């Protein structure tokens, strides 16, 4: 009888242990699932439902249309705040004109259509739509940072439609004239002033390009330094200056902290991964490895109201 009690007690104990292990496993699995879902929704923006507007100030049979052309991004929250912010500012400034959206990246267009059921025209589709709608005058404002390959491709595409409209006018990229540089410097330094404590390097990450237009980064660096912001540094993710230059700058200035901000219209893949990601080769990781405190700011230039107004001024010059 005593042996039977021992066996029953042992079985009961084993049962309790098994139940405990199962519960722990379920809890761990649940946590992993939540973490995985959070990672998946970071890009799609499902945590905060967003609404894309692709046509503003909609009119019947508009003679003149403003088309805002962007590369695009699949990061929904950033797209609404940045590209949407620029488009909205233009629409508000010119309420008598219909404003339409077009993207140049077919990969992003296809991804948004498949993942989110969001339909956005590419440039050719937007031009064909304008022709079909009987639009006579087209004002095209790109949100590009510089006059590089993307801008050249857009210009060539518009030339194919020169006989389809009474007029096609193409606006300038963000950084074109000296006054543009001055306005951008004022906008970004005002936006970052709360981080400027004398012990912090403020680094802006641009995309970079093999085109001659890559020189805009050196020019912006020269002008921002000349304006007295000697703790500001410009780098690029795919060209020169590079993260190595940013690290050297931060070391030379004996800075303790580095604030990272995209020098891009949107805070998309480059900002979230190449700049602020946890991978070993991200700017954040490389700077932390060198002993710096790193503060990533995941905000695209397009959500800065002062930057939005520069694009508004470029459109105004065409109307």
Q: PLM features: what roles do these ranges have?
A:
Residues 19-23:
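C-terminal motif of bacterial Sec signal peptides marking the signal peptidase cleavage site
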Residues 14-18:
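Alpha-helical transmembrane segments
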Residues 1-11:
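Bacterial N-terminal signal peptides that target proteins for export
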